[in-house]
């Protein structure tokens, strides 16, 4: 579960390395915590030099991995080792061209099909 002030890793090659959650936009209503598939507003805390995204820039991101266990529709429980997000634009398309690490199938149902197609492994 991601809440404001949570630090996240970036799971794409957009140029940012670490994010800090500022606000949970989510998918429905006024949510306090973000789960897999929810959209957040975040600030870049660490970035790769000479890239378009810079430190202290405010961006939108979608959560792709959380340390808190996540129960799938078929009953399988998935838990990751880190909290990670993919940086997106206003239309929901990823800013990077590659996605690192495993991604859950539920992102496809939430209309993040472009992120799922870039992922090397879908659980």
Curated annotation (Swiss-Prot):
The keyword rRNA-binding applies. This is Large ribosomal subunit protein uL14c. NCBIfam families: rplN_bact (TIGR01067). The gene is rpl14. The keyword Ribonucleoprotein applies. Belongs to the universal ribosomal protein uL14 family. It holds the Pfam family Ribosomal_L14. GO terms for biological process: translation. One of its GO terms (molecular function) is structural constituent of ribosome. It is found in: Plastid, Chloroplast. InterPro entries: Ribosomal_uL14, Ribosomal_uL14_bac-type, Ribosomal_uL14_CS, Ribosomal_uL14_sf. Binds to 23S rRNA. HAMAP family: Ribosomal_uL14. PROSITE patterns: RIBOSOMAL_L14. GO terms for cellular component: chloroplast; cytosolic large ribosomal subunit.
């Amino acid at each position: 579960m991601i809440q404001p002030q949570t630090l996240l890793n970036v799971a794409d090659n957009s140029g940012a390395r670490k994010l800090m959650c500022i606000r949970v936009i989510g998918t429905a209503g006024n949510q306090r915590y973000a789960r897999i598939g929810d959209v957040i507003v975040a600030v870049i805390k660490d970035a790769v030099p000479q890239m378009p995204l810079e430190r202290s820039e405010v961006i939108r991101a979608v959560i792709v991995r959380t340390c808190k266990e996540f129960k799938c529709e078929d009953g399988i429980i998935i838990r990751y080792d880190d909290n990670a997000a993919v940086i997106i634009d206003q239309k929901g398309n990823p800013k990077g061209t590659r996605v690192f690490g495993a991604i859950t199938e539920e992102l496809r149902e939430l209309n993040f099909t472009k992120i799922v197609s870039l992922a090397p492994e879908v659980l």
